[in-house]
């Protein structure tokens, strides 16, 4: 067994974006049977090939499994993930109150409806409000319990006319930004954005999604619904299907009676199961409380490999490094060394989420080296 300690943990980003390997923001594993490091001439030829108009970037299945991607850490377990989401509902339904509630809980890291919440900076563009109304609303909802991680603005530029730069600057100045709420989407659409074609809607969402993915954060876009009913309730979202088609998911808030306090929140997305939550609005604080969930949150089945690593390898060690063969010798599992490396590339996100352990695989002169270390910045 090889066991070493380092004074400082290696700098590895564990974030949200699953589309990019850990090569710029993370680390890219090399195939277990990979060759020598590429020469300058090989890299030059590869760059020339990539610049050709006919070049199509592909990745083999072997390369896919030999690459470690960053996992999407949820902002709110089972409910809100990094990506671009539409939050739709009829006007004057209480959407902005629920947005303030989400923003407050993420900025403080306090559980929302008993769902675990991860703390981060939040920017709320309340573009249909003013600061006086915001102050009164927040005081009614939370009293004077405040937070330094929640920022508001009641004016912003439009897409293609300054908003992109404003958001990029805010994120650059607040590195731990996890959530940006734009209330409402219509307020930031480009001038002449009344063109509700599929192509136009898809392009708008793709542009916003590109920003959210690049920064590994959640972009929540408040939007309205149509008056007409639809067999699929998400078809009630105003605009064309291009909005939902390009988004990572959507939330749909509906009241049973417009004058009542009961509502349903339906959730559909790529990174969470479809679900329906039954909410009730507190008449004093105007906070939304959870009455019940129609379905229990789906949980991934236990993964013995991760439990073995947490218990046998990392229980008394803040840091461990060694070869895949050395790791296999430590755990009570029948698994081949090259298989364990690939499996850990896939499960690295779960290892961090469930046990607070970071993982890196890299090739050195002696062969492949695996490294594990505990993250002390937050609890697992």
Model-found features: residue ranges?
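DNA transaction DNA-binding modules
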Residues: 278-380
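Conserved RecA-like P-loop NTPase ATPase core
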Residues: 80, 103, 124, 183, ...
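The Walker A/P-loop phosphate-binding site
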Residues: 46-145
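Conserved inter-motif catalytic segment of the P-loop NTP-binding fold
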Residues: 70-71, 93, 116-203, 210, ...
């Amino acid at each position: 067994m090889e066991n070493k300690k380092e004074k400082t943990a290696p700098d590895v980003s564990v974030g949200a974006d699953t589309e990019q390997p850990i090569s710029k923001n993370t680390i890219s594993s090399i195939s277990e049977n990979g060759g020598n490091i590429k020469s300058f001439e090989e890299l030059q030829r590869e760059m020339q090939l990539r610049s050709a108009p006919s070049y199509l970037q592909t990745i083999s299945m072997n390369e896919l499994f030999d690459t470690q991607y960053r996992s999407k850490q949820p902002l709110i377990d089972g409910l809100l993930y990094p990506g671009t989401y539409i939050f739709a509902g009829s006007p004057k339904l209480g959407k902005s109150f629920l947005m303030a509630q989400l923003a407050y809980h993420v900025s403080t890291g306090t559980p929302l409806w008993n769902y675990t919440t991860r703390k981060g900076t939040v920017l709320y563009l309340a573009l249909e409000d003013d600061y006086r109304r915001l102050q009164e609303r927040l005081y009614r909802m939370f009293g004077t319990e405040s937070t330094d991680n929640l920022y508001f603005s009641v004016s912003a530029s439009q897409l293609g006319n300054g908003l992109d730069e404003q958001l990029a600057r805010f994120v650059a100045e607040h590195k731990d930004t996890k959530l940006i709420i734009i209330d409402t989407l219509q307020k930031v659409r480009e001038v002449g954005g009344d063109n509700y074609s599929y192509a136009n809607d898809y392009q708008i969402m793709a542009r916003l999604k590109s920003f959210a993915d690049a920064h590994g954060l959640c972009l929540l876009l408040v939007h309205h619904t149509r008056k007409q009913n639809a067999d699929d309730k998400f078809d009630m979202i105003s605009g064309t299907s291009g909005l939902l088609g390009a988004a990572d998911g959507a939330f749909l808030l509906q009241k049973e009676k417009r004058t009542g306090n009961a509502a349903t929140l339906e959730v559909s997305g790529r990174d969470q199961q479809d679900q329906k939550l039954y909410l009730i609005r507190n008449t004093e604080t105007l906070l939304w409380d959870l009455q019940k969930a129609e379905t229990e949150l789906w949980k991934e089945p236990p993964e013995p490999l991760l439990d073995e690593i947490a218990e046998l390898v990392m229980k008394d060690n803040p840091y461990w490094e060694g070869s895949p063969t050395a790791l296999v010798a430590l755990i009570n599992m029948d698994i081949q060394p090259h298989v364990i490396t690939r499996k850990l590339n896939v499960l690295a996100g779960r290892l961090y989420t469930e046990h607070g352990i970071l993982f890196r695989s890299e090739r050195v002169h002696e062969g492949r080296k695996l490294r594990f270390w505990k993250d002390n910045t937050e609890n697992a």
